[in-house]
């Protein structure tokens, strides 16, 4: 197995900049930003000109809505409730995203 270096996320004055580290089999875009940066805070994600609101669970939003949340592996991810974020948003591995703390 070859391990690819995607770099580490970096704190900014408004939040954290990271990238998509992998795309899971559901099409969720999993970032390299750990949950510890957003837990207990109000936040959203900016990626490719989109502002994506955060939520706690998929049931917090309607089917088909784009959301940012902490996934089961402890990373911030972009997902679509009952959908495929990778296909719909056309974002790919290593693309930059930013968590904005509000």
Segment roles from a protein language model:
Residues 1-32, 37:
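Anionic-ligand-binding alpha/beta catalytic cores of soluble enzymes and soluble regulatory domains
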Residues 17, 66, 96:
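A residue-level signal for beta-strand positions that form part of recognition/binding surfaces
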Residues 30-90:
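A conserved acidic, glycine/proline-rich C-terminal tail/linker
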Residues 93-102:
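Surface-exposed interaction regions enriched in Ser/Thr/Asp/Glu
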């Amino acid at each position: 197995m070859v391990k690819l270096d995607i770099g580490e996320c970096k704190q900014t004055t408004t939040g954290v900049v990271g990238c998509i580290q992998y795309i899971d089999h559901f099409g969720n875009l999993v970032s390299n930003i750990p949950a510890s940066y957003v837990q207990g805070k109000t936040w959203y994600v900016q990626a490719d000109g989109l502002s994506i609101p955060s939520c706690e669970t998929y049931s917090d939003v309607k089917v088909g809505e784009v959301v940012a949340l902490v996934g089961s592996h402890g990373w911030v991810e972009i997902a679509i409730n009952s959908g495929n974020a990778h296909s719909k948003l056309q974002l790919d591995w290593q693309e930059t995203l930013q968590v904005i703390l509000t």
